[in-house]
Amino acid sequence: MMIWLYYLTPPPPPPRPKTAQEEVPEAVSPQEEPEAPTSERTGQSAEDSLDAFSRAVAAPERRLVVETELYTAELSSRGATLRQLTLKHYRTWDGKPVRLIADSLRGALELGWLTTTNRNVETRRLLFSLEPGTPDTLRVGASDTLRLPFTWALDSLRRIRIEYAFTSRNYEIGLQVRLEGLRSLIAGRQIDLVWDSGVPFAEKDRRTEAMEMGAFAYSGGVLEAVRLDREDTERKTLSGQVDWVAVRNHYFASVLLPGEPTEGAEILGMRIGQKPEDPEYAEHYRLRLTLPFHPDSARLEKRFRLYIGPMEYYRLAAYEKNLYRMVNLGPGWLDWIVRPLTQYVFIPVFTFLGRFIPNYGLVIILFSILVKIALHPLTARSYESMAKMRALQPELEAIKARYPDNPQKQQEAIIKLYREVGVNPLGGCLPMLLQLPILIALWRFFPSVIEIRQKGFLWARDLSAPDSILDLPFSIPLYGDHVSGFTLLMALTLILQTRMSGSGATQGQMAFLNYLFPIMLFLFFNNVASGLSLYYLVFNLLTILQLKFFVRTEIDHATLMAEVQGKKGRRGAKKSARR
């Protein structure tokens, strides 16, 4: 159990516009945009045509705001990119709206390629134009789809078009990219789509959130991850078809899903600072998808889907792309059993209960009761087996005294005794081992469930965070600077449970073993999600009731041997009846 704790402890036509709600920079009229070369047939060289890329850099930009029921997005005409995205129904630990795009000064999305003259083209440096009459603020109706196209023209035949599609009740944003007549300006056979933005911190416990942060790429059924828990910079490169790339923090993610074949991807992470607790600490991730572009093609058109929102299981599962694989549900060697338990048992049951019960603390209590009922046959058999083993101690001592110098005879006599009593020496351990995958799955389940985030119960303000009932003026190693109420009660009930089960030593120095495991859990659980501590508290209380009313934990030696003699008599009577 201590090894398990060591490895598992953590140390979401366009509608008629309404009045704008915030100021945006003054729109740039088409006349103010830089002039582009008039035609490919004017005799200009590719080198002259590329001057338009440079002239576009210094032009002013225009910003637009798109509002849906779930989020507010800010886009810029410079680069036709997303500048900010703020969720409406989620808050950070200090009450501010959660921003999933907030630290990208140049925008989060761009196209890039190498020209035939060895120049790097980045669309975030280009000024795109909008359709005439496009307002500064756009609102998406409940059942509408808003399409917002941006166009950059080198001349009448060569252009870049980037179009976004927004819906009101979904965190998905459609993206369509079209390049026309640019084949003479693109070297090689590929272009890159780059997502260049981290996901900012949103939780009070920055250390735990930093452990969950990372960038991911999924290809051929294999998940590649970049985490900055050891190195300041890490990079991974993939080739061939890539199903998706993503970056996440504890509860939120930005995912880029290509709708067309790819030729590879790169995920890069950079860490600023050393300790997540420091205010200046930050993690920045860059995702790059490589797209094929045949040099003989007059036009390139690609479609993508962006998911920028909470990591709710059913929203991610709807894509059928194994997006939930980036959620850590336990150690890899147990993933084959822990992940199905979580995704197909715990999450469906927990979600079902949450539809009918308004408070998630009550959901956790009822969930604990259901799990306890499901495990009752295993735990009852375990406790009864241990009780029988304790009652057999006099018989075992007598066998050892009868054959002091013959271990083989001892073993034969002990096996015969076990067979007569109906006891398996592993009967006390095996049911507990069978429960281990369930316990591991629950250990990771509660910290990863966004439904309980910032939901309170009793004195706990947030079931996804520790429930401090006393803040200490100092920090204790391995424990922290506070006392968690549910954890304290959990440890006390575990001591009572141990004493009732009769499994602990009660004489001399060995009596301390009754308290060692509860003390260690009290230390380890002090900084975990209070929802997890609440679950184990209720589970311990149910175990106490189980031991009191439903399980034999004390079996008298004489009573047990009388049961054995009774079994022998019944077997003898059956043999006589057969004769």
Give the residues covered by each predicted segment:
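Helix-loop-helix
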Residues: 1-25, 75, 175-180, 194-212, ...
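Juxtamembrane extramembrane loops of integral membrane proteins
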Residues: 8-94, 100-104, 150, 568-579
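Generic detector of short, locally flexible boundary/turn motifs and exposed helical patches
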Residues: 36-43, 48-52, 138-144, 156, ...
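Soluble non-transmembrane domains of integral membrane proteins
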Residues: 58-327
